């Protein structure tokens, strides 16, 4: 096993001290900004209500796309199709009929 160089312990302590000082300065700056600008502590992200509304609108858009794809498939194909969520992003899936085996 190789021994650590003599100056490496000093370098590690120096790095830890620098990081601690930077962290302290960062906290001080954040605290002074929130005291000077009380509105700065307001989160910039939108509330969950907007996210739920966006998700609902997205689902309605997908449902409309599925309906259009299903109508197109029925009009231009002799096969059977259903709307179902697919792992591969397909809006509609073909349905294969089950045939009774011949005896």
From Swiss-Prot:
> At the top level of its lineage, which domain of life is listed?
Eukaryota
- Which segments of the protein form a coiled coil according to its record? none
| Alphabetical list of InterPro entries matching this protein | SOSSC (IPR031821)
Localization in the cell: Nucleus
Main location class? nucleus
Tell me yes or no: is DNA damage among this UniProt entry's keywords: yes
Q: Name one GO biological process term.
A: response to ionizing radiation
**One annotated Gene Ontology cellular component of this protein:** nucleoplasm
State the UniProt keywords alphabetically: DNA damage, DNA repair, Nucleus
Free-text function comment from the UniProt entry: Component of the SOSS complex, a multiprotein complex that functions downstream of the MRN complex to promote DNA repair and G2/M checkpoint. The SOSS complex associates with single-stranded DNA at DNA lesions and influences diverse endpoints in the cellular DNA damage response including cell-cycle checkpoint activation, recombinational repair and maintenance of genomic stability. Required for efficient homologous recombination-dependent repair of double-strand breaks (DSBs).
Description of how the protein assembles with itself and partners: Belongs to the multiprotein complex Integrator. Component of the SOSS complex, composed of soss-b (soss-b1/nabp2 or soss-b2/nabp1), soss-a/ints3 and soss-c/inip.
Q: What protein family does this chain belong to?
A: Belongs to the SOSS-C family.
Provide the protein name.
SOSS complex subunit C
Protein species of origin:
Danio rerio
Report the gene name: inip
């Amino acid at each position: 096993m190789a021994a650590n160089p003599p100056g490496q312990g000093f370098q590690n302590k120096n790095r830890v001290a620098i990081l601690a000082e930077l962290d302290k300065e960062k906290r001080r700056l954040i605290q002074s900004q929130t005291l000077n600008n009380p509105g700065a502590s307001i989160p910039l992200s939108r509330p969950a209500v907007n996210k739920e509304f966006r998700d609902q609108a997205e689902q309605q858009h997908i449902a409309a796309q599925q309906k259009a794809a299903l109508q197109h498939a029925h009009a231009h194909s002799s096969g059977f199709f259903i709307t179902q969520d697919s792992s591969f992003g397909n809006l509609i899936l073909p349905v294969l009929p089950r045939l009774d085996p011949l005896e």
